[in-house]
Amino acid sequence: MSTTPSSVRRWVVRGTATAVAVVVAAGAVTAAHAIGTDSDPGRPAGRTVTPVPAAAERVCAGSALRLSDDAGNDATQASTVGTATVATATTGSTVERSSLDASTTGGSDPRLLTAPAGETTPQVAGSSLQSVSSGDLVGAGAASCDDPTQSTWLVGGSTETGRTSLITLSNPTDVNATVDLAIFDGSGTVNAPGTTGIVVAPNTQKVVPLSGFVSDAASTVVHVTSSGGQIVAHMQETVVRTLTPGGYDIVSGGAAPSRAQVIPAVALADAQAAQRGDDAADAAPIVRLFVPGTKSARVTLGISTADGSGATVNATAEPGVVTDVALDDFPDGRYSFTVTSTEPVVAGARSTTPTEGNGTDLGWFASAEPLGDETITAIAPGEGVRLNFVNPTREDRSVTVRSGDERRTLKVLSGATVTLPVQTAKQLTLTGTEGIVAGVTYRGADGIAGFPVRPATDVSTPVRVYP
């Protein structure tokens, strides 16, 4: 392809909430490089390139899943049970909701949230909650609505008898996504056919049972990577203890491997009572760790509450195997867990609570990335909602939570945790949150659940281009 001094070729690559514009003017750039400018004779002329505003998209987890149809047949296909409630927020004018199509393996009817582009690229956020009681599928599950990405760490799940873990792979893009699953358990890396080259068609979701790759694994971690289209990955775990429902929840993606991890919001509610009865070994609260490197990690787990109380637990995590650190004798409350490690780790937490009818519910709580100075979020309606802020930085922070004309300012001291009751189903704008990590917990008669508050999506800004 050729250019002339007066011709300009523009290529615009559109993506989720970002846009990149590349401008080439061959003759003009060559001349400027040779003669400079009047104001700076020795400096090549530059050009400011402004990205084209793009729509913002996030994908929610969808509804609860069962590996059968309504009649209990076809255990190779996932079918939905009930409907999740979704709350949304945007800095734009509106949020459009649509669904991704199910594949041959079924689907959770995930919601695609789209904030159309305006004069600038908007932000969009959301979360979902579902309380379900259908046969042996009972409990509360919550999840964040997430940006598509090429890498997701799912810290949670089990394939022991009575435990069903389903990975959902949602592709909101217009190209095929080729997905690889790196699966780890307490023995190390799971080597099984079918974990690589999983094709997820554009604008569809594929459901992948974890038991298809590994059986009788008490503790699992899954690293989901994709090429081509980007993916939003979640994991649903359901538990049946003999014949008694043992809970349901959704594992949201956690923070990437790091020597410092924060699980900002964990709910503990009568965990000792949840461990009574048969087949209850996995009802105890734990922090799950995985070291993806080659060296053992010395880990310190800091456990704190908003009233300033807390404890420290020391552990060792061997490389390449999943480690569960038991948390015994902690009173009921809303906690934050801070993990410091000598090697990069990923982390998540699980707790269990009694529910009506002698059942239990489990909750999985993901680690989270630090927020920027301003973030929007929306919390799906549910019982016993709290918003947790954790300040892992060395400086105190003044955080403002605004909903419409209402606002509240909180002092979050360095190293401290603050818990706040908040309105649900309304847009919340969080400011002053640079370096803060935040999460949401639910605690009620239906069980416990939670999700991390996601940072604002990175948006391209104007750049100065020189030859």
Explain the meaning of each model-derived region.
Residues 249-341:
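Long, internal scaffold/assembly segments composed of regular secondary structure
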Residues 14-34, 222, 230-233, 299-301, ...:
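Hydrophobic alpha-helical membrane segments, chiefly transmembrane helices and signal peptide h-regions
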Residues 93-107, 188-217, 308-334, 403-427, ...:
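Intrinsically disordered, low-complexity Pro/Gly/Ser/Thr-rich segments with frequent PxxP/GP/PP motifs
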Residues 1-8:
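N-terminal Lys/Arg-rich, disordered targeting/topogenic segments
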Residues 48, 169-189, 226-227, 281-309, ...:
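Short acidic, flexible loop segments centered on an aromatic residue
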Residues 66-108:
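Extracytoplasmic/periplasmic/luminal assembly and interaction segments
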Residues 9-72, 129-168, 233-292, 346-394, ...:
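Conserved functional hotspot residues at active sites or interaction interfaces
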Residues 104-139, 168, 172-174, 199-249, ...:
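Hydrophobic, ordered structural segments
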